[in-house]
Amino acid sequence: MAQPLDFLLVSICLFHSLFSFQVEDYYAPTIESLIRNPETEDGACVFPFLYRSEIFYDCVNFNLKHKWCSLNKTYQGYWKYCALSDYAPCAFPFWYRHMIYWDCTEDGEVFGKKWCSLTPNYNKDQVWKYCIE
């Protein structure tokens, strides 16, 4: 009884090692990739950027303690940790519902915190962030 189970476990491990692969840009940047891929383009964050087939308009954190951004329009392994000055700026003016806003607003926010759109048309893109007061 133990031999078939051992064979099954060994087969599963072998199958997994042969047919699984890692796509480098599928995973979040690691400290090793930061060392291997130094900052370029003066270390400026590029927004929006494409990562894992998704578009991001601000700094993100995937499996990392701190937020990071891509240094290319399409993530190519070049990235950096975000400082306060790196976060995406509000897009003023922006269109929300039937109004144009030139400043942060509390409209539509349940908790009464001011927010802004990260694109000129919130109705279409629906990407936003809370404003720093």
UniProtKB/Swiss-Prot annotation:
GO-annotated biological processes: single fertilization; sperm capacitation
Subcellular location: Secreted
GO molecular function: heparin binding
Glycan attachment residues as annotated in the record: N72
Disulfide bonding pattern of the chain: C45-C69, C59-C82, C90-C116, C104-C131
A cellular-component GO term for this protein: extracellular space
Signal peptide: 1-20
Tissues showing expression: Expressed only in the epididymis.
Alphabetized InterPro entries for the sequence: FN_type2_dom, FN_type2_sf, Kringle-like, Seminal_plasma_PDC-109-like, SP_Capacitation_Regulator
Similarity section: Belongs to the seminal plasma protein family.
Function in brief: Binds sperm in vitro and promotes sperm capacitation. Specifically promotes capacitation induced by high density lipoproteins (HDLs). Also binds heparin, phospholipid liposomes, and weakly to gelatin. Does not bind chondroitin sulfate B.
Protein's name in the database: Binder of sperm protein homolog 1
Species in which this protein is naturally found: Mus musculus
